[in-house]
Amino acid sequence: MPANTRHRRETKWFPSVWRLCLLAGLCLPLTGCIEDQMTLNLVGYNHTDRSIHRYGVNEYGGGHLQAHRGGGGFTCCISIPRAYKPGMTVTVWGSDWDGKNAIKRVVEVPRYGPDEGGRFAVHFLRGGEVKVFVTMMGLGHPDYPLKGEDAEL
């Protein structure tokens, strides 16, 4: 076998190794994004007179909410930044069975701390307003962020 052919065969793998290293190097910064996220259970509360067939936050679906009910079930999971970012918003969506009363709201997420994660609560309030909270507590707890008439189901 000529020496030139042998050398080519031994170095054939070399470009593949470089491609693999380049791919790994490009993916490395993405691991920082993943580490900066916290995963929360999604929970919904419907304070309105109409059932909500489906609801969700951004691309995460939450299921069905009967009128004047909620908090009884959790959907896994929603990811948000571990560190609060001022002005952070989410898109909350929902619809009834026939889709005629679909809603879509861009809602600002109130300030939260990294130790407050546990639930991402969505409240569909009377009058079409939507509020969200990152909290460890359930509706009815004295320290729950939603107070007064708004907190009534």
Specify the residue positions occupied by each region the protein language model found.
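Bacterial signal peptide processing site
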Residues: 34-36
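Tryptophan-paired
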Residues: 55-100
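Beta-strand-rich cores of mature extracytoplasmic or soluble domains
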Residues: 90-153
